[in-house]
Amino acid sequence: MTQHLDICIRGGGIVGHTLALLLARDRLRIGLVAPPPQSSSEPDVRAYALNAKSKALLESVRCWPDAMHATEVTAMQVKGDDGGEVNFSAASLAVPALTWIVDVPALEAQLRDAVRFQSHIELLDAPRPATLTVVCEGRLSATREEFGVDFTATRYPQHAIAARLSCEKPHAQVARQWFKGDDILAFLPLDGPLGQSVGMVWSAPDARTPELLEMDAQDFCEQVEELSEGCLGKLALISPRKAWALQSAQASRWIGVANGQSWALAGDAAHNVHPLAGQGLNLGLSDVAELADILHTRAYWRPVNDVKLLRRYERARRAEVTATDMAMTGLQQLFARQGSGWQKLRNWGMQGFELSGITKHWAARQAMGL
């Protein structure tokens, strides 16, 4: 006879696996719908910036990668298009690192291994009835649509182009970002403290994206070198280029009941934000940390689908996600505006922020999840 599940998690990515491991500690019966990973001959370009809060969460389930696959960022440089510049350093904030750039395949492999050794987690090929279903399927979630949840999306006029680059010079554990007109370019240091490769994310105008994807590798790297002011010397592509449309989006409801089935959304199934500050996965991990904590501390007589508990989760997470999304959209629109007046205003603002002391310190610690 099939055992009844307390919680069925639909979605086998980082967010879904982490939630399963957190809930299993409370001896709940968990089903995880997670198809086996598909093998590919192409290198995986994905890397995420994870803050101290996310690091602590993953360490709590013993799934933090080693130093070669979770590169400490000890400094950040952000440059505007007219001399504005903001710098952060771990030393000035008295922390070991500002953030960590995590290799996604390495993290996913550790999470899969941890789940396999958990007796309270059952890997499923298809969803099963459960007291609560948590949807972690990403922004194209079919289950969210099945449950009749509106997902209001606003497209930015940009695509993100991601790739991995080898560099002539070591990255020195510095994350770098440039705002130049319609372009936002970020370099994320990889392969440990002495690494000479970076994860590149280039938010480029929609109209230019096809050209940049089809461009000869050498010509593409020359454009990246120019945009990055040659800071790491000669660059070479070491992965394919991948691209996706950028959008701001949030589900109209994060919890509910459909066809007698209680459900909650988490991660990109609930929200999307612009990647310019690298907060996407941090928000998703904060979702599952909040949900797991609420279920862990519930009164013994409350079921896991208690609507008061789920509403508490929705209120808490919607507030943070909305604030982050507004900040990211505001920054994107500020730097997208053309004209010398706007250019001077935003770069003056960057210089003021650089000299602001307490405000800059507070903003840095917020981004770090401290």
Q: Where would I find each of the regions flagged by the language model?
A:
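Active-site flanking residues adjacent to catalytic metal/cofactor-binding acidic residues
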Residues: 10, 33, 136, 267, ...
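Hydrophobic "anchor" residues on beta-strands that sit immediately upstream
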Residues: 6-7, 30, 131-133, 264
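Glycine-rich FAD cofactor-binding loop and adjacent beta-loop-alpha segment at the N-terminus
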Residues: 4-8, 12-74
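Conserved FAD-binding catalytic core of PHBH/FMO-like flavoproteins
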Residues: 58, 133-243
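Conserved N-terminal helical subregion
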Residues: 2-3, 56-60, 68-147, 152-160
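FAD/FMN-dependent oxidoreductases across multiple families
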Residues: 208-305
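C-terminal helical "tail/cap" subdomain of flavin- and related membrane-associated enzymes
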Residues: 293-370
